[in-house]
Amino acid sequence: MIKAVLFDVDDTLYPSSKLAEEARRNAIRAMIEAGLETDLSEEELYRELQEVVKEYGSNHPRHFDLLLRRIGADPEPKLVAAAVVAYHDTKFAYLKPYPDVIPTLMQLREMGFKLGAVTSGLAVKQWEKLIRLGIHHFFHEVVISEEIGVEKPNPKIFIEAARRLGVKPEEAVYVGDRLDKDIRGANRAGMVTVRIRRGKYQDMEPRNDDDVPDFEIDRPRELLDVVRELAKD
């Protein structure tokens, strides 16, 4: 019997990849407007920034300093500050959940399910997202990789989330967008898995049996039919 529903955060509850791209592009424009001298175009600078993010990880605190050094420019505080302000202004202005997320979370709570979030990243950053999205209060538990010491797809983070919610892994449904992180890890933990086809990874194909979800949906409200069907078992 299903007793809990757990969610990934980025690109599952809000358009993370799209928002990050727009914020980074605006940061590039802000540096140019602040006086960055370079022969590279905006698009070339964006590609260089993407390489920095890929190499150092999305949580590195000094992406823009690294970008400037990468292109042979002096990382002047003015340029870095302009990029940081533009980046955060963009993210904060447009950080909103997908339209059907809040009604779905409300209905799941009304149906009596315990709700949880399982996400990789820095704890403060992930909590900030949930609070700014206005959805943190829906979750009984939020489990973040930095606090646990392992990241998806390690099944330990999913098992810990189930433990905190007071349910067995097989009594939990997990919803996420990435087959190689969300679905693989939750499957290995023994949960019922639901892939939501949204964002950057919507066309990803399974690499092995662990990447195959039990269900696929296109939007959160379709999850309600899934849990109703599972409740019959």
UniProtKB/Swiss-Prot annotation:
InterPro entries: HAD-like_hydrolase, HAD-like_sf, HAD-SF_hydro_IA, HAD-SF_hydro_IA_CTE7, HAD_sf. CDD domains: HAD_Neu5Ac-Pase_like (cd04305). GO terms for biological process: small molecule biosynthetic process. Keywords: Hydrolase, Magnesium, Metal-binding. One of its GO terms (molecular function) is phosphatase activity. It comes from the Archaea. Its EC number is 3.1.3.-. It is an enzyme of class 3 (hydrolase). Its cofactor is Mg(2+). Belongs to the HAD-like hydrolase superfamily. Catalyzes the dephosphorylation of D,L-glyceraldehyde 3-phosphate in vitro. This is Glyceraldehyde 3-phosphate phosphatase. It comes from Methanopyrus kandleri (strain AV19 / DSM 6324 / JCM 9639 / NBRC 100938).
